[in-house]
Structures are given as structure tokens and as C-alpha cells.
Amino acid sequence: MSKQNKLTKVLDNDLDDIDIEEDDSTNRKFESMSEDEETPGMCCECTDQPAEVVCLQCQDELCTVCSTSLHRRGSRRSHIFKNKHGQELDYDELNKRDRQPPLHGKEDEKVQNNNNNNNNTNNTNNIEMDDNKSINNNNNNINSINSMYRGTSNLLNPLPFHHTNQQRNGGGSNNHQINNHHKDEDEEIDEDEEKFIHKNENFTDFIPRLSKDWFTERSKYIPIRLNIRERNDLRLLEAALHVSEYTDKIDIIHVGGSKSKRINDQLRGMCAILSGLLVASDFKKGQQLVENKDFFENEEFFQNVFEIGRRHKIMNPAKMRTEYGKMIHLLQDAADEDVKKNLSGLNMIKPLKTVFLFLDERNGLKLLEDPLLELATREVLAENKTRPQIQREIREKEHAIKTLSRRYSSSMLKSEEIEVCIYSICDNHTFLRENRDPVKKMKHLLKEYFSPNQSERGFSLALEHGIGGARLSHNHRKQYNYVYQSLSLWQHILHDMFKLWYFAEIDLLCGHRYQLSNTGQGLNRIQQCPNVGKIMHSILRQTQKKVGDDWVGSSVIHLGDHNVPNSLVFIDKYTQISRILSPIVLTIEYIPKITDPNLVAYIKNTFGGPQTLTKIILCDFFKHAFDGSGADNFFDAGSCIDGRLTSAWQWSAQIAKKPYYPIFLLSGFSGFDGSFN
């Protein structure tokens, strides 16, 4: 680009093109297609999924989710569809046939035919096990992992095995109305799982709730707990990321210079900092590292350090709040082939070390099939138990762990390593209790204090557009269903958060190009999220089937656009759910425990009593945390999948203005955002 053209673009405030059209051809890697440019073969409704069918009446090319959601009711249900093979299908045939998200490629079509002919989840498990074996053969190539999972991610069931079995047998599909006094099928199954994880009776008196398929499937996405040596490397990584200014140097609108050169300089600087910190902490080990002057010769060290950081963050979402974003952006650029060439072929990315892969490498997968694993991984909680009961459960659990470690130990798999795998699965149960259970409690509170069929005077959930900041217009019943369905969706998302996080990192670190753009929330990297998108559509479809055909609101999932630019933003957004809901649940549970006479009098005089105060808090949350507000403009607001959580963010930001805010403070509330330390 000539200097005159550059000057013209500067005067026109068109700086984005100047940054993209740098002289260095490497920078073209980071360009992206214009948002307005239509991609042929994509769904005309959501625009981010491949079109699978054509409606002969509407003449629209649609994906599986959009075609079924848009034609659920009314005269559209009688429309005829034609799939990519030329077959004509009515709505019922389409809904029955397309139970899975769309597959692509010859290998995917073969898998799909197997599913249609056999309808057997064992085929899926076999395919997944073969795929995971191929990971071990390609440990140093993240692109091979991405291509491998691109065809199989939609086969991986986002719910436990018995969830799928129950639904295929026809359960839960006839009840389309939410009843205040009856539990739906999804909640009953989740309660069975919760009883397994948090058993209150004697440990030995139990019926196995979770099959070996559940442990095998979940273990594919459960990271291995860090050992002491890895924790030392983690401290080095956190210190290096804390002082790094990587995103400040790279993610900027830069008029001149080569972006690839800046990336190369920053990556070399990060490697140098890590090497220096290692020398300072362990001179003997650091001396061996610095003897190799080329960073490529220390590739294994850098791969292990960054993998440890990724694994630690997944297991502890509240940790590395600022450092994790820097690390992912750094690795995202390091995955680019041109950047690797500038670093002498240095590859900083390796597959995540999960329980399944760890056991598979050491021929220990039989551990996941042992019925005793249920007892060994169950949580011991102190609620409503005496001290002798707690101590007995602890002894029984420890005995089960020791038995399994002796039974499956070998020359390739030590007993200590088996215990680490078992404790890692226990960490997954703890994650579910801390993150998913608040959503389940909010669903119970919704059912306990509100009825979908009639509203109590002064506690109606009805919304009207423009009143109280609402951008939706719902009557009481519709808003009740909308809240219930949103909470059910969040519950399923958090249930499979490890799986979503696993594939989110694959989307981020696969080497796909991104576009640096101002999304209204600052400069963000807009990148497509194919694997996360497929899993999210599968979760959405499962949720819609469980709550019935009467789905309220939009089914559009924003991924890879200005609302949710990339998988990193997606993960960060949905890990906030428990931070929003947990303080509300704690406050509601705290209110009946208040015994101070002055506080009791204050609540009675101001709010009308503890019961009324509870209803006021819940009514305000269920109304205005789900009213479609929170976006920068009208078009981005509403009832889409992403917008439901955006409204909850907006409500939490205004908590200090609520009349019941002092009650939150009394319960120990300090904020919804958690700690960044």
C-alpha cells in the first residue's frame, strides 16, 4: 500500500485495513473474511453451521437445529424438507432422524450410517477410544488432534450414558409443560447422580448409579491433578505471565511494522523469562536449560510448562484470572506455522494430560470399569451427619482407593499414579458441586416459590418491553418457562464444562487465523469455534427435548462474532454462572437463620418478614436477570442463548442499588466477580 493510500485511510479513520495490509505476507494469516460476506453452504438463519436441509416451501437452507426449531409449531410444521441426499422428509421424520448434530466428511458419513443402523452408544464409545489412541501417536501435533475431533466431537454425548438411554426409551418427551409440583425427567436423573456423588447413607449400602461408560466418557476430559514438581513449574509460569505485557504489545492497532516480528520478539522474551526464572529457582536444572542456546532444543520443557498451566486452570477456574488469557493468546500465535518457522520450528503446544490418556498410555483403562471406583470417587460431605458417620465414610473411601491402587498397579502404572487418577475424578465431582449445583438450587427455588399456572399478587414474573429496562414482553407463565429453560440449559452446560473447555482449547490452538477487531468490548480476536459450536448445539438440542417443544426465546448460539468473539470468551462467560448464582443461594439460605432480634425486626418492618423478603429477591432476579437487557444496542439484546447470561450480568452489576442489598452484605457477600489474586 502506498503512503498516499495510507494517509487517506488514516484520515478516514480506517485503521483496521492498514494493520491487516502490512508488507509482511505473514500478517495475512491474521486476516479474516468480512462479516458481511456470505459463506455458501451455511445455514441462512444462524449463519455459523453448515446447511443440512432445504425447506421446499420456505426455500431456505437450514442446519439441523434451526430447521426443527423454526418449524415446531403452526403451519410450518407441515412443510416438506429435502436433505443433501435428495430425500424428502416431513417434520417428524426430520426430527427423528437428526438426533445428532450434523457430521461432515466421508469418515463422518460412515460414522453417521453406523449410528442410524445400530442406534447403539457402544459404537460411539469404540470410535472415541480409537480416536483417543490416535492422540498418543500425535502428541507433538495439535493440528492432528483438531482434525481428529472435528469429525467425532458431535458423537461425544454431553450427558451421562444413562441420560441418553432414558431419553431413547421415550422418557421425558411427552410432558411439554413445566409443573410446579412434579419433577421432570432430567431433574430426576440428575438427582440420582447427585445421590451417587454425595451419598448420605452408609457407603456400603448403595446401588451403583453410574456405569463404567460414564467414567470412561468423563475421564477423557478430566485433567490429571498436578504433582509437587509440576506445581513448582506452575509458579514459574505464573510469575512469567504476571510480568509479561504480551497482549499489550500484540493486540493493538499498529499502523507500521511487522506483526509477525512483534510476535516473534514477545515469544522469545517469554521463553527467556521462563529460562531465567528456572535458573533462579533450580540452578542445576536451569543450567542444563541455558546450555542449549536455541529455544527449539528446549521444546519439551516449554510444552510441559504451558500444559501444566492449562491443566491447572481447567481444574481451578477461579485461578489465573488474568494470566490464563495472556497464555492462551501467546499459544494461539505460537500455533501459527509461519511463527514456528521464525522460532526454528519451536512447538509450545502438547495435548492435555487427561485421566483417560494417562491410563491408556500405561494400559490401565480397566480401572475405569471397576465397580469399586464409584465408592472411591464419592464425595464425603458433613451435612446432616454425625462425626462417627463422617469418619466411617472416610475410612471406607480410603480403603476403596487403596484396594484399587493395589489391584491395578503394574510395572507401567504405579499405585501412587492410580491414586492421583482417582483423586482427579474426585476433583471433577467437586467442580460439579461448586458450579452446577447452584443452578439446580435456583431451579428448586423457582418451583418452590412460584407456580407457572398462576401468579401471587405482587410477585408476578410478567415483563413488559420498556418497563424496568426490560426488552422482552412475557406474561407470567411464559417468563416462568423462559427462566426454567435457561437454568436447565446452564445446568447442562456446566455439567459438560470440562468437555467444552477441552474442545475450546483445540479451537483456539489449532492454528486457525483470527481477526483483531473492536467488538464494542475493546479489541478482541474473532475466531471461529467449530468444535465448541457442535457441542453447544448438541447440548441445546438435548435441553429442548427434555423441557418440551414449547421452547421460549431464540435458539441462536453466538460464537465467533462480535458478541462472543472466540472460545476463550465463551469459557470465561459461562464460568461466571456459579459466581452469579452462588451468592444468591447463600443469601436465601442465610435469611431463615437470622436470630438477632434487631435484624429480625428490621426485616419484618422493611420487607414484611423473612418469607416475603425471600420472594422479593427471587422475583426480582427471575424477572430482571432474564429480561433481555444488558447489550450495547437493541439488536444484540434479547432471548438468544448468549443474551440470557448477558441479562444476568446486567442484573448483578446493579445489585448495590437494590433495597435488599444490606441483606446480601450481612450474609457475607463481597461481589459477584470473585478474586483476581
UniProtKB/Swiss-Prot annotation:
The keyword Zinc-finger applies. This is UPF0652 protein. InterPro entries: DUF2009, Znf_B-box. Pfam families: ANCHR-like_BBOX (PF22586), DUF2009 (PF09418). A zinc finger (B box-type) spans 38-84. Residues 91-111 have a biased composition (Basic and acidic residues). Keywords: Metal-binding, Zinc, Zinc-finger. Zn(2+) binds at residues 43, 46, 66, 71. Residues 113-126 have a biased composition (Low complexity). Transmembrane segments: none annotated. Residues 91-142, 156-192 are annotated as: Disordered. The keyword Zinc-finger applies. Belongs to the UPF0652 family. It comes from the Eukaryota. One of its GO terms (molecular function) is zinc ion binding. Coiled coil: none annotated. Residues 163-178 have a biased composition (Polar residues).
